[in-house]
From Swiss-Prot:
Descriptive protein name: Protein RecA
Protein purpose: Can catalyze the hydrolysis of ATP in the presence of single-stranded DNA, the ATP-dependent uptake of single-stranded DNA by duplex DNA, and the ATP-dependent hybridization of homologous single-stranded DNAs. It interacts with LexA causing its activation and leading to its autocatalytic cleavage.
DNA-binding listed as a keyword: yes
GO biological process: DNA recombination; DNA repair; SOS response
Organism (species): Histophilus somni (strain 129Pt)
Gene this chain is encoded by: recA
Length: 355
């Protein structure tokens, strides 16, 4: 029988062989804080950047963002484009759904004059355009919206009642086999937006699945499940959504982190709201009763007023964001512990309210 030392050596050898064959990050310990040194593009959400482990979405990789309708998928990708453009990167949007609103995109901070956009006629054309952009080496971010709208040419040219079994899945599988190597070589971030469908006849387990077959699940380095979990109201008026994102797959850092943030209509991700919440959680912003204070100065009674103060003082907001980003990305275990503490405190308060 093998000794513990021999088992440890055998495990180390096996892990080394796997990383040599499939690349660094193919396997890691769940609680491991080590991350790959990969360039990242911010998502526009500080908490999501921290949950991803490297400060955003990884360059040179494929990312899938999926969720139900009106959950914030396109808003999140437009936020990624806005952040990439601020960093001087070239972005392209392949609008297979033919539904991109340039006015809304501009409100989220996207420079629509510089954004490359294509509205292809069929799935083959969309993926050929994506391939050409990636191969050029001149485009840094490509968004495909969405996989469900990548309709094969044969289906478009056929009759309405014709059956085309597995056409879209085969199309995606072939395209990803071609794309994946070029994406790595050109250091381009390719984001596929996907929709959710229900599997028929599933009694046990999750009946939800994504469109386009299984190929994208395997080729994606990061998969984000985005959901709308509530509404934000100003009186009786709904002004935004409470959004939850779970990192269901992550090849560049430990997966399964979950974050909540707000998406405000016409504004996008509430950056100042996140700064207040994360600042309180990590002791950079003090909360006493309903009052919030930052560096000894009271900044507002209630979260809304504190957010207004940050909006009126962008320099202070930028400093607070930089402090949080550097502290949490340098110490991901601290961020995880703070999340667990906050969750336990909320559970305790729920139990107390029940009594």
């Amino acid at each position: 029988m093998a000794t513990p030392e021999e088992k440890a050596k055998a495990l180390e050898a096996a892990l080394g062989q796997i990383e040599k064959q499939f690349g660094k990050g193919a396997i890691m310990k769940l609680g491991e804080t080590q991350k790959l040194d990969i360039e990242a593009i911010s998502t526009g959400s500080l908490s999501l950047d921290v949950a991803l482990g490297i400060g955003g979405l990884p360059m040179g990789r494929i990312v899938e963002i999926f969720g139900p309708e009106s959950s914030g998928k396109t808003t999140l990708t437009l936020s990624v484009i806005a952040q990439a453009q601020k960093a001087g990167k070239t972005c392209a949007f392949i609008d297979a759904e033919h539904a991109l609103d340039p006015i809304y995109a501009a409100k989220l901070g996207v420079d629509v004059k510089e954004l490359l956009i294509s509205q292809p006629d069929n799935g083959e054309q969309a993926l050929e355009i994506c391939d050409a952009l990636v191969r050029s080496g001149a485009v840094d971010v490509v968004i495909v919206d969405s996989v469900a709208a990548l309709t094969p040419k044969a289906e478009i040219e056929g009759e309405m009642g014709d059956t085309h079994v597995g056409l879209q899945a085969r199309l995606m599988s072939q395209a990803l086999r071609k794309l994946t190597g070029q994406i790595k070589n050109s250091n381009c971030l390719v984001v596929f937006i996907n929709q959710i469908r229900m599997k028929i006849g599933v009694i046990f387990g999750n009946p939800e699945t994504t469109t386009g077959g299984n190929a994208l699940k395997f080729y994606a380095s990061v998969r984000l499940d985005i959901r709308r979990v509530g509404s934000i109201k100003n009186g009786d008026e709904v002004i935004g959504n409470e959004t939850r994102v779970k990192v269901v797959k992550n090849k560049v850092a430990p997966p399964f982190r979950q974050v909540d943030f707000q998406i405000l209509y016409g504004e996008g991700i509430s950056r100042n709201g996140e700064l207040i919440e994360l600042g309180v959680k990590h002791k950079l912003v003090n909360k006493s009763g309903a009052w919030f204070s930052y560096e000894g100065e009271k900044i507002g009674q209630g979260k809304t007023n504190a957010m207004k103060w940050l909006a009126e003082h962008p320099e202070q907001a930028a400093i607070l964001e930089q402090k949080l980003r550097s502290e949490l990305l340098a110490n991901p275990e601290k961020a995880l512990l703070a999340d667990l503490e906050a969750e336990s405190e909320s559970n305790i308060s729920e139990v107390e309210s029940d009594f």
